Curated annotation (Swiss-Prot):
Domain MGS-like, residue spans: 1-148
Native organism: Alteromonas mediterranea (strain DSM 17117 / CIP 110805 / LMG 28347 / Deep ecotype)
NCBIfam families linked to this entry: PRK00881.1, purH
PANTHER family linked: BIFUNCTIONAL PURINE BIOSYNTHESIS PROTEIN ATIC (PTHR11692:SF0), BIFUNCTIONAL PURINE BIOSYNTHESIS PROTEIN PURH (PTHR11692)
PROSITE patterns: MGS
One cellular component (GO) term of this entry: cytosol
E.C. no: 2.1.2.3, 3.5.4.10
Domain of life the protein comes from: Bacteria
Pfam families from the UniProt entry: AICARFT_IMPCHas, MGS
Protein name (Swiss-Prot/TrEMBL): Bifunctional purine biosynthesis protein PurH
Catalytic activity as recorded in UniProt: (6R)-10-formyltetrahydrofolate + 5-amino-1-(5-phospho-beta-D-ribosyl)imidazole-4-carboxamide = 5-formamido-1-(5-phospho-D-ribosyl)imidazole-4-carboxamide + (6S)-5,6,7,8-tetrahydrofolate; IMP + H2O = 5-formamido-1-(5-phospho-D-ribosyl)imidazole-4-carboxamide
Length: 532
């Protein structure tokens, strides 16, 4: 069993000074000698703490405008020295051991996220001494503790208090892992930034070149949120990893209020439902089954929206995922638990009364994800293929009503335009080939994932007929263009009065002529929404 190691000397050098003064004060009160640099040393000294500048400790001043501060044998020897092995070398070179290193790095990510950031700005925010100390301390975690996150300050102090000023090996090892993760993420961000600037080679300062969105090598770091019982199928091992520092309301950041542990498929389906419901400003409900919306509706309140969404396809809604864009209230919660079996309910917030209602069904997973008003976080989608990874920008595209191009003789009415926009938002989240029928802010039929677009149209009609929903007078959305007129003919047979689609087929005119023959109004968006 490893013996806890006492903390007698600490080196503190942080860019993010959150909590550092209180932490340093507690260390001082525990009898720890404080070494520090630059702004951190200034902050501690101004607070009256007895802090020793690194330059005084090494006998060598900071040079090159602070570029060289801690890169000195007395610092790295003190960190890397193996206790019980290197004492003679330390004594010969007048090196004192450093037991605790507290470092976080220059804010490179925040710097390059600024649209006014120049190449020189980025270069000056590449930390050199910090990562070197972090890696040295993490390497020598047998004897040295490394802290890179202010969230761990209280943990360190609590353990020191319980162990007479010492820290256990398990804590040092865990913090060392965090340190290596921290430097890996940091170096990955730098590599991504410079890898996307390959055409700027030779620029002396900054340049006006158009840089690639995608670097030569792509580095990402995710943190495991939980192990899962299994993957998409029971014979597959799985875990859920989340992006670091994500701020957007999402399934990754949601708080589970009750219910069984989320499964792999629960998480995937909940993401599909939540991202779809985010598209709507009015109170809305989205019900998802196997990653496809099977019912979507808006209403004056979420209870009305849920009632209407459920009516689209009550059969498929069984065991589905339900997402709302308003707080879940008790009336809506009652309607759900009294009516159907549901796997997951997710909403921005959940009232106390709604929590009590849902608690009667203890297995239902209830999630609160927070508000997303105005959020559109930049980012990428990833799709693994054997031996590689497809990377693309997230699909934030959505046309406005005024951008629609009317291509038929008959123009859609104002009511039809509203339904067309609603239907287009739903189609964006239906697996291709996607055909969606909608009427009065409610889906009446969804045809998803067919190899032939006309069969998706037929299935949407069949689904509506199965639930005794009236298609006549509805509108239709297609996630991509119609390659032939047969999809329009099928829509006309079902009673569709208006169509929204991207356009762009070689046979667009044939499709337009078909719509005119049937008296159907049709608009082009100029934007496709394939979803695979």
């Amino acid at each position: 069993m490893q013996t806890p190691k006492p903390i007698k000397r600490a080196l503190l050098s942080v860019s993010d000074k959150t909590g550092i003064l209180d932490f340093a004060t507690a260390l001082h009160n525990a009898g720890v000698e404080l070494l520090s640099t630059g702004g951190t040393a200034k902050l501690l000294a101004e607070a009256g703490l007895p802090v020793k500048e690194v330059s005084d400790h090494t006998g060598h001043p900071e040079i090159m405008a602070g570029r060289v501060k801690t890169l000195h044998p007395k610092i790295h020897g003190g960190i890397l020295a193996r206790r019980g092995v290197d004492e003679a070398v330390m004594e010969e070179n007048n090196i004192a051991p450093i037991d605790l290193v507290v470092v976080n790095l220059y804010p490179f990510a925040a710097t390059v996220a600024n649209e006014d950031c120049t190449l020189e700005d980025a270069i000056e925010n590449i930390d050199i001494g910090g990562p070197t100390m972090v890696r040295a301390a993490a390497k020598n975690h047998k004897d040295v503790t490394i802290v890179v996150n202010a969230a761990d300050y209280s943990r360190v102090l609590a353990e020191m208090n319980d162990n007479n000023g010492s820290l256990t090996y398990s804590t040092r090892f865990d913090l060392a892992i965090k340190a290596f993760e921290h430097t890996a993420e940091y170096d990955g961000m730098i590599a991504n930034y410079f890898g996307a600037r390959l055409d700027s080679t030779g620029c002396e300062a900054d340049c006006d070149h158009q840089h690639s969105e995608f670097p030569r090598t792509y580095n990402i770091q995710l943190t495991k949120k939980q192990d899962l019982r299994y993957g998409e199928n029971s014979h597959q091992e799985a875990a859920f990893y989340v992006e670091n520092n994500i701020q957007e309301a999402s399934v990754a950041t949601a708080t589970q209020l009750q219910g069984k542990e989320l499964s792999f498929n629960n998480i995937a389906d909940t993401d599909a439902a939540l991202e779809c419901v985010k598209e709507f400003e009015e109170p809305a409900c989205v019900i998802v089954k196997h990653a496809n919306p099977c019912g979507v509706a808006i209403g004056n309140d979420i209870l009305t929206a849920y009632d209407r969404a459920f009516k689209t396809d009550p059969t498929s809604a069984f065991g589905g995922i339900i997402a709302f864009n308003r707080e879940l209230d008790a009336k809506t919660a009652h309607a759900i638990v009294d009516r159907q079996f549901v796997e997951v309910i997710i909403a921005p917030a959940v009232s106390d009364e709604a929590k009590e209602v849902v608690s009667a069904k203890k297995n239902v997973r209830l999630l609160a994800c927070g508000d997303w008003a105005g959020q559109l976080t930049e980012g990428y989608d990833f799709k693994r293929v054997n031996g590689g990874l497809l990377v693309q920008e997230r699909d934030f595209g959505m046309v406005e009503m005024e951008d629609l191009e009317v291509v038929t003789k008959r123009k859609p009415s104002e009511e039809e335009l509203r339904d067309l926009m609603f239907c287009w938002k739903v189609a964006k989240y239906v697996k291709s080939n996607a055909i969606v029928y909608c009427k009065d802010g409610m889906t009446v039929g969804v045809g998803a994932g067919q190899m032939s677009r006309v069969y998706s149209a037929k299935i949407a009609g069949i689904k509506a007929a199965d639930e005794n929903l009236e298609v006549a007078g509805s509108v239709m959305a297609s996630d991509a263009f119609f390659p032939f007129r047969d999809g329009i003919d099928a829509a006309a047979h079902a009673g569709i009065k208006a169509v929204i689609q991207p356009g762009g087929s070689m046979r667009d005119q044939e499709v337009i002529d078909a719509a005119d023959e049937h008296g159907i109004a049709m608009v082009f968006t100029g934007m496709r929404h394939f979803r695979h």
